[in-house]
Amino acid sequence: MKKTTLLVILDGWGYSESDYFNAIKNANTPTWDSIWQDFPRTLISASSLEVGLPRGQMGNSEVGHVNIGCGRVVYQELTKIDKAIEEKTFGNNKAICDAIDNVIQKDSNLHLMGLLSPGGVHSHEEHIFEMIKIAKQKGVKRVYLHAFLDGRDTPPRSAESSIKKTDDLLQKLNLGYIASVSGRYYAMDRDNRWDRVEKAYNAIVNADAEFVCNSALEALEESYARDQSDEFVIPTCIQKDGKLIKVEDNDSVIFMNFRADRAREISHAFTDENFDHFPKDRHLNINFTTLTEYDSKLKCNVAFPPEQPVNTLGEVLMKNHKTQLRIAETEKYPHVTFFFNGGKEDQFEGEDRILIPSPKVATYDLQPEMSAPEVTDKLVDAINNGKYDCIVCNYANSDMVGHTGNYEAAMQAIEYLDKCLARLKDAILEHDGNMFITADHGNADMMVNPKTQKPHTAHTTNLVPFVYVGHKKAQVALEHGKLSDIAPTILNVMNIAQPQEMTGKTIFKFEK
């Protein structure tokens, strides 16, 4: 029977001394309080340069899990793309040039689509603006933007500024206009809710939508009048002089999101010949280009293909003939598998995976416990049966409920998690295992913006906890640690040598 080392990632569980609408601090958490008091712990960085993002940029789940799993700072697509723009190499990118050459040669339209937002989590509006300028410089005649609106990694009603900037730029360059708008709830689903994706797809491709407006700003105003914030704007087509824009054969479409998980579904709708998740009247004969690789199975051009890290935690465990389990509910399953393995879809030898379905509710404040009880049942079973040397799990609650902006529901989510932690702690200590508890970024630690007094639905840049629970004596050996130091710490407690590719340092020193 194996003594399990368990890594618990509490998604969106940041640390803040402030109790102002801090769902984590103000919730009733007897287990967490006792763990924080009785076991070795520290705070580590999960944002900014320490995780390969631009200075001051909040972390996110994808970035967090890549850094944790790789055991080194992994420079993120946002940083890579910013660098290409800064060094003026963005416009020379082969995939981008091919998409632009296609429309120039065929006198067709260039469609840009993506999250029009300064959020920097799934996209950045500056990349879209740069793309529009490059299209103009290279002689493209018509550019149409299909804008997905945020309100999740940005304040819920903040899209007006982004739309105005885009309208001004397109007007100044006399190049085109925003041809459709959709809330990210529809265009960027990641949980197989294809009815949502269908609405966004039809608005973009077929100019077929429930609403038609004369401008993107008008569409936004009408949505607010229906009490639908940015995230939930129903896909709307924009007409100019009575004309609606469709995606036609020979057009080029460039998807400007750089994060994969919420870009996959609609990309498959554009590119899969045998797509069957909703009816399509035709298969598009277009140049479809994505800024980064969303899925290796997609038939498209990729502007910034992934760099494959070697000797990630999962790979090192496999090479040392260790068994491992990855477990999460649907919302965070890609994070403990694909992202944690450094962008590899395939399982390692000796790696098992358990996917617990997320509840089918419109928003998770309606069910703050989400699927945490089921995740915990499976975890406790796995610890008790001693099958695995290492288990990595993710609890989605503090992030997904945090994103709703519902403070009371977020506190309920934290209290559910506290009960789950009690069960895990008991199981680990009973079987003489090791448990590390951390987070990939903050969220529920600030549910209301103290400056604006409005709901805060985005991530925070706060530090996150890193705690050791077990019978070994441990001391903090590293001040100012970061997410990339977690994998070396796990290898240390498991007495496995750290490979040179892992540049992180061990956070705790354990008495042998």
UniProtKB/Swiss-Prot annotation:
Cofactor entry: Mn(2+)
Enzyme Commission code: 5.4.2.12
Recorded GO CC terms: cytosol
Role of this protein: Catalyzes the interconversion of 2-phosphoglycerate and 3-phosphoglycerate.
GO biological process: glucose catabolic process; glycolytic process
Binding site for substrate: 122, 152-153, 184, 190, 259-262, 332
SUPFAM superfamilies attached to this UniProt entry: 2,3-Bisphosphoglycerate-independent phosphoglycerate mutase, substrate-binding domain, Alkaline phosphatase-like
PANTHER family on file: 2,3-BISPHOSPHOGLYCERATE-INDEPENDENT PHOSPHOGLYCERATE MUTASE
Gene Ontology molecular function terms on file: manganese ion binding; phosphoglycerate mutase activity
Subunit structure as annotated in this protein's UniProt entry: Monomer.
Similarity field: Belongs to the BPG-independent phosphoglycerate mutase family.
Pfam families reported in the protein's UniProt record: iPGM_N, Metalloenzyme
Active site: 61
Reactions performed catalytically: (2R)-2-phosphoglycerate = (2R)-3-phosphoglycerate
Binding site for Mn(2+) 2: 11, 61, 440-441
Protein keywords: Glycolysis, Isomerase, Manganese, Metal-binding
Binding sites annotated in the UniProt record for Mn(2+) 1: 399, 403, 459
Protein name stated in the entry: 2,3-bisphosphoglycerate-independent phosphoglycerate mutase
Pathway the protein takes part in: Carbohydrate degradation; glycolysis; pyruvate from D-glyceraldehyde 3-phosphate: step 3/5
